[in-house]
């Protein structure tokens, strides 16, 4: 295995028998390996735990750590459980149905290790049909993101997150929709640095919304986003006028997403 860097990878697992191995393989193929890989089973109730044990046995003893939750708490709380146990200076999150470019950790860690004012980074993603040979990437240029941008738009997918282990904030416990965006808004509201690289270092295998998984429920996603703005408003981070304007813009985005899903469904029928 390649040289390791002080990064803990956390993968929340829920009934992911068909995709988990692909995600783990993408971590194993990193040019700079993470210090550890933490698999958190969110009370799947199927053979996911058996697969986790099999994967653990394939690699160096202690490199893959298993966390077995006895109640289903959702991805946000599962990520927190792994985060709290992480030993690395940084924590990277990967969803069980996604994967990474082989140089993701190398390039992201290099930036975070030097940018002491940044507590969270993310990067671009690309949709694939299957895990394949990745395009050669030699560098990733990270740029700071202003708070105004974070409020208007979720800047990157959760599978691109790398955070400082000692960050005080966590994903909102029990939240099952748009918890990643709320987390970023909280951090940005506190004046802490967030940066993004446009380079595609995460691979997804289905559309961001309108397909299998939690994101398929557009209305619940919409309610989650509206709740985010109201919570941030109540905390005094933004004004009432800003909340109203952001909610209006959110509904416009919802209409666009709904139209995209409708067109996609019509295309499949044809």
Describe these PLM feature segments:
Residues 9, 84, 140-220:
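Conserved nucleotide-sugar donor-binding catalytic segment
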Residues 19-21, 46-55, 99, 103:
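Acidic helix N-cap motif at the loop->helix transition within catalytic regions
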Residues 25-34:
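Short, acidic, metal-binding catalytic loop of nucleotide-sugar glycosyltransferases
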Residues 26, 41-51, 71, 95:
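A conserved acidic beta->alpha catalytic loop
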Residues 69-86:
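Glycine-rich, basic loop-to-helix element that forms the pyrophosphate-binding segment
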Residues 91:
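Short aromatic/hydrophobic "clamp" motif used to bind/position activated sugar donors
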Residues 103-135:
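Conserved donor NDP-sugar-binding/catalytic core segment of glycosyltransferases
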Residues 200-201, 210-270:
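Non-catalytic, C-terminal membrane-associated alpha-helical segments of glycosyltransferases
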């Amino acid at each position: 295995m390649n040289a390791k860097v002080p990064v803990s990878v956390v993968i929340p697992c829920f009934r992911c028998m068909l995709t988990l191995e692909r995600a783990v393989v993408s971590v194993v193929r990193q040019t700079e390996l993470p210090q550890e890989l933490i698999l958190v089973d969110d009370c799947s109730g199927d053979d996911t735990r058996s697969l986790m044990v099999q994967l653990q046995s394939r690699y160096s003893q202690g490199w893959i750590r298993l966390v077995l939750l006895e109640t289903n708490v959702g991805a946000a709380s599962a990520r927190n459980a792994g985060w709290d146990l992480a030993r690395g200076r940084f924590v990277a999150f990967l969803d069980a149905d996604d994967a990474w470019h082989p140089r993701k950790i190398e390039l992201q860690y290099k930036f975070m290790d030097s940018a002491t004012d940044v507590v969270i980074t993310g990067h671009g993603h690309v949709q694939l049909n299957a895990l394949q040979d990745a395009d050669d990437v030699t560098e990733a240029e990270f740029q700071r993101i202003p708070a105004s941008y974070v409020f208007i738009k979720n800047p990157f997918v959760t599978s691109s997150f790398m955070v400082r282990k000692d960050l005080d904030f966590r994903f909102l416990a029990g939240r099952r929709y748009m918890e990643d965006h709320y987390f970023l808004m909280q951090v940005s509201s506190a004046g802490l640095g967030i940066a993004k690289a446009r380079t595609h270092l995460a691979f997804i295998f289905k559309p961001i919304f309108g397909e299998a998984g939690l994101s398929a429920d557009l209305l619940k996603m919409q309610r989650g986003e509206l709740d985010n703005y109201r919570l941030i408003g109540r905390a005094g981070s933004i004004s009432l006028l800003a909340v109203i304007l952001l909610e209006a813009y959110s509904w416009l985005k919802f209409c666009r997403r709904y139209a995209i899903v409708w067109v996609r469904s019509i295309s499949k029928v044809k």
